C-alpha cells in the first residue's frame, strides 16, 4: 500500500470525498492525511471517549480507522505513523453501531434499528432467551464476545445523536429516544470489565438527563486542545500535504499564491473548538475545492439544516445576534428538548464557532466560522423568512450585486426596499451583509 501511495503522481491524486471506510480508502489509493499518531495517543491514554464535531468533518472515517486498528490490520497502516508506533497488532472483537443510516420518527424506528444491529451480533456470538430487552441483549453480546474470543470488546458508535436530532421539537419522542439509548448504553457501565475501548461520536451533546449520564468515566474530548486535529484539516497539514496543489489551484484561479491562500482561509478555515485552539478547515469543502479547482458552497450542497430553521422560528430568535452571540460553556455544551436557546445546536452543528473568550466571566464569543457558512446559511434562511423561494433567492442576491457594480443605485434601493417589506422583523435587521469587497 505504501509503495502504491508513493508511486501515485500528484496530478492523479484521488481525493476521498464521501469515502468513510478506511480500508477502502487505503486499498484504492485515496489521498489521506495521517491522523494515526493522534489515534494511537487516544487509544493508549484512555478507554471511554465522546467526540462531537459538525457533519462531514471526518467522524465516520475516524471510527472506521479505529475499527481497522483494533482488527489488527497492520497492512492498512503501511507508511503511516501507526506502523511504527504499534508493536502488537492484537485483534479484538468489535461491536460497531452506525445510527446514521435511518430516519427516526417513532419509538419503534429506533428500537427496530437497534434490534437489527443486535441480531447481526447475535449471529456471531449467540443469544439467551432470558435477555428480553435491548439493553440486556447488548450486555449479553458484550459478555459472550469477551468470553468466546478471550479479548475484551471494542465498542464504536457513529452518530449516536441522529435519533435525538430528528426529534428536536418533539419533547415526547425525544424523551422516548433518550430513555431507550440511556438504557442501551448503560451496558457499557455494567460490562466495564469486558470492554477494552469505547468511542462514541455525534454532531451534538445532549445535556440534563443525558443518554450518557450513567457513564461517569466517559471523557468528552470535544473541547480538548490535544485532539483538535483528530477531525478536520489544519493549515499546517494543508501545507505539508497539499503544497503543490496549492500552487496549481492558485494558478487556475489566476491569483498570487499568498492571496489565494488567504481566500482559501476565508472560505473554509475558521472552526475553533476551544477558546485558544488553532483554526480547522472543513475537510469536505476543502477537498471538493481542490478536486474541482474552484470555490463553492460544497458543505451546503450536501444537505440543509431544516431542524435549525424550526428552532430559530420556534424561539423567535433575532438573527442580528447570530454574528456576535455570547454564551457560557454550560449552555454551549448541552442541548435538551426544553432549551430556550437554539445556540447550542447551531454551534455544535458547525454554523457558529468560537471567535473569542472572556476569561474573567467565562463567556464565549461566537460567530460564523467562514465565508462559506455565513453566505450559505443566510442564503438558506432567506426563503424561510421572505416571500422568495429557494430558486429565486440566489438570483435576487445576484441582482443586488449586479446593480451595485453597474452603478444602478436606484434599482438597488428599490429592490432592497421591496426585499425588507416582505421580510419578518427577526431577519430584517440580521447580519445580511453583501460581500462588498467583491462588488468593486
List the predicted regions and their residue ranges.
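Single conserved hydrophobic/aromatic residue that forms the stacking wall/gate
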Residues: 1-10, 431-440
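Phosphate-binding site recognition
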Residues: 11-429
Amino acid at each position: 500500500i505504501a509503495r502504491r501511495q508513493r508511486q501515485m503522481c500528484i496530478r492523479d491524486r484521488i481525493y476521498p470525498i464521501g469515502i468513510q471506510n478506511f480500508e477502502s480508502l487505503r486499498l484504492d489509493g485515496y489521498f489521506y492525511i495521517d491522523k494515526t499518531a493522534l489515534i494511537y495517543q487516544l487509544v493508549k491514554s484512555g478507554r471511554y471517549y465522546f467526540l462531537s464535531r459538525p457533519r462531514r468533518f471526518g467522524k465516520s472515517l475516524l471510527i472506521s480507522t479505529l475499527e481497522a486498528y483494533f482488527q489488527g490490520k497492520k497492512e492498512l497502516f503501511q507508511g503511516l505513523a501507526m506502523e511504527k508506533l504499534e508493536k502488537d497488532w492484537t485483534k479484538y472483537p468489535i461491536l460497531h453501531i452506525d445510527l446514521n443510516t435511518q430516519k427516526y420518527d417513532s419509538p419503534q424506528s429506533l428500537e427496530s434499528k437497534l434490534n437489527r444491529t443486535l441480531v447481526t451480533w447475535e449471529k456471531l456470538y449467540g443469544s439467551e432467551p432470558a435477555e428480553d430487552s435491548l439493553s440486556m441483549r447488548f450486555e449479553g453480546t458484550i459478555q459472550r464476545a469477551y468470553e468466546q474470543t478471550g479479548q475484551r470488546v471494542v465498542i464504536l458508535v457513529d452518530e449516536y445523536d441522529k435519533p435525538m436530532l430528528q426529534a428536536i421539537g418533539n419533547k415526547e419522542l425525544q424523551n422516548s429516544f433518550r430513555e431507550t439509548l440511556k438504557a442501551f448504553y448503560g451496558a457499557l457501565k455494567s460490562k466495564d470489565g469486558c470492554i477494552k475501548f469505547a468511542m462514541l461520536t455525534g454532531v451534538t451533546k445532549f445535556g440534563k438527563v443525558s443518554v450518557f449520564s450513567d457513564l461517569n468515566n466517559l471523557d468528552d474530548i470535544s473541547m480538548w486542545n490535544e485532539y483538535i486535529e483528530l477531525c478536520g484539516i489544519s493549515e499546517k497539514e494543508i501545507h505539508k500535504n497539499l503544497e503543490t496543489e496549492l500552487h496549481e489551484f492558485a494558478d487556475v484561479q489566476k491569483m498570487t499564491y499568498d492571496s489565494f491562500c488567504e481566500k482559501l482561509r476565508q472560505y473554509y478555515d475558521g472552526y475553533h473548538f476551544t477558546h485558544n485552539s488553532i483554526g480547522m478547515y472543513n475537510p469536505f469543502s476543502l477537498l471538493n475545492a481542490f478536486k474541482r479547482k474552484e470555490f463553492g458552497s460544497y458543505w451546503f450542497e450536501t444537505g440543509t439544516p431544516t431542524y435549525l430553521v424550526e428552532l430559530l422560528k420556534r424561539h423567535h430568535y433575532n438573527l442580528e445576534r447570530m454574528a456576535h452571540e455570547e454564551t457560557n460553556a454550560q449552555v454551549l455544551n448541552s442541548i435538551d428538548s426544553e432549551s430556550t436557546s437554539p445556540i447550542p445546536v447551531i454551534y455544535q452543528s458547525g454554523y457558529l464557532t468560537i471567535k473569542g473568550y472572556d476569561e474573567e466571566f467565562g463567556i464565549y464569543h461566537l460567530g460564523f466560522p467562514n465565508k462559506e457558512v455565513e453566505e450559505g446559511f443566510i442564503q438558506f434562511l432567506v426563503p424561510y423568512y421572505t416571500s422568495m423561494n429557494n430558486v429565486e433567492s440566489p438570483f435576487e442576491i445576484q441582482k443586488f450585486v449586479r446593480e451595485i457594480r453597474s452603478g444602478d443605485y436606484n434599482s438597488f434601493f428599490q429592490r432592497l426596499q421591496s426585499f425588507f417589506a416582505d421580510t419578518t422583523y427577526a431577519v430584517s435587521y440580521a447580519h445580511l451583509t453583501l460581500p462588498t469587497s467583491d462588488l468593486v
